Design a protein with these regions (language model features):
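Conserved short beta-strand edge segments in small beta-sheet-based binding/regulatory domains
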Residues: 54-72
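Residues that form generic nucleotide/phosphate-binding pockets
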Residues: 12, 71-82, 115-119, 253
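Conserved structural scaffold segments of CAZyme catalytic domains across common CAZy folds
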Residues: 44-46, 66-81, 101
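Class I S-adenosyl-L-methionine-dependent methyltransferase catalytic core
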Residues: 1-51, 55, 100-101, 128-132, ...
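Short amphipathic alpha-helix with an adjacent loop that forms part of the alpha/beta core around
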Residues: 76-87, 272-278
Length: 338
């Protein structure tokens, strides 16, 4: 799980026709910091990371950085693009202070803001609730809780997300909005909303993408795919889960979120009835690996994981075939075993 932020970030960049290796470099120890420095061609590209990124908690423009506040203030002062923003009297603003690895008192936060009084003489008014501009002084202490001196300090302008994200328009709002706790129709194998959203991103689902879940169950994996504009299909061998019970079914979930209901087919994936080579853009599923639910089939025994790759890789569009083994064209989960 701790490495999911990089594959998802790679997928988000790929959706924008950007090469991940040209945009950022992975840290040697990715657990040491929650921050990733990404170079992007425009604010539109940056905001997309928040609009689709489930593991992206905030997107910021770097105005300055340093190991000390003296170095940080000097770096901000040298940032030429700030002048137009600072001199605009119509732009309201606020400055937040946060630290990863350390809790700061209100007095400490105020003292840190005072460092920028002279280099950032904003012409606009201060507005704490809904400012036009939100800035963040961020100290990166690291995972060593014994330290009190930051390894890095940043002065950032918020572009998207940030704070608690809820209600701020980013994709992380969907984690709460589509939680299973309030889902109309669920079962023991329904995929957690956050995980399903991540899978959707890693499968590169975009508006108009043709997506299939060969183990659709209650449709939990296809909910985010449809949310992001995918045209979805699902198959399952169990007719009971497809039809639902007590007046609730897969259709109930999609009606709940006002989404297009996927086309559903009862099918045995060991003998798939689908005859549509190079048709789908993505296969996104959670196979029945036998822990919460076992695999059901008619006919002879087969290795269903191998069958899934063999069968559905031939049904992916030609441009998606090279991603079938990298969880980008085909994305599914398997349990980790020791």
């Amino acid at each position: 799980m701790q490495d999911f932020r990089f594959p998802e970030l790679d997928a988000l960049l790929t959706m924008q026709d950007l090469k991940p290796e040209d945009c950022y470099t992975r840290e040697l120890n990715p657990l040491s910091s929650p921050l990733v420095h990404v170079k992007l061609p425009s604010e539109t590209h940056a905001k997309f990371l928040s609009q689709r990124g489930i593991l992206v908690k905030g997107v910021y423009e770097v105005w300055g950085h340093g190991h000390t506040y003296a170095a940080l203030v000097e770096s901000v002062d040298a940032f030429a693009e700030k002048d137009t923003v600072v001199s605009d009297a119509s732009l309201s603003w606020k400055i937040q202070v946060d630290a990863f690895g350390l809790k700061l008192s209100m007095e400490e936060q105020t003292a840190r803001r005072e460092n920028f009084r002279h280099v950032l003489p904003f012409a606009g008014p201060v507005e704490m609730k809904n400012p036009a501009l939100t800035f963040l002084i961020l100290e990166d202490i690291g995972v060593d809780q014994q330290k009190t001196t930051p390894d890095r300090i940043f002065f950032l302008r918020a572009l998207a997300g940030g704070e608690k994200n809820r209600g701020r328009g980013g994709a992380r709002d969907l984690v709460d909005a589509q939680t299973l706790k309030r889902r109309e129709y669920i079962g023991p194998t329904s995929m957690d909303a956050e995980m399903a959203l991540i899978m959707c991103n890693m499968a590169l689902v975009q508006p108009g993408s043709l997506v299939i879940d060969p183990f659709v169950g209650t449709g939990s994996v296809l909910v985010p795919c449809t949310t992001f504009g995918g045209i979805c299909f699902g198959t399952d061998i169990d007719s009971r889960v497809l039809h639902g019970k007590a007046g609730k079914s897969i259709k109930s979930n999609f009606d709940q979120y006002k989404l297009r209901v996927p086309d559903l087919i009862r099918a045995d994936n060991s003998r798939s009835p689908l005859r549509c080579p190079h048709y789908f853009d993505a296969v996104v599923c959670d196979p029945p690996y036998g822990i919460r639910a076992g695999a059901r089939k008619s006919g002879r025994y087969v290795d269903y994981i191998s069958l899934l790759f063999h069968s559905f890789s031939t049904r992916l569009c030609a441009g998606q075939l090279d991603r079938a083994a990298t969880a980008a064209g085909v994305c599914f989960l398997r349990p980790e075993t020791n």
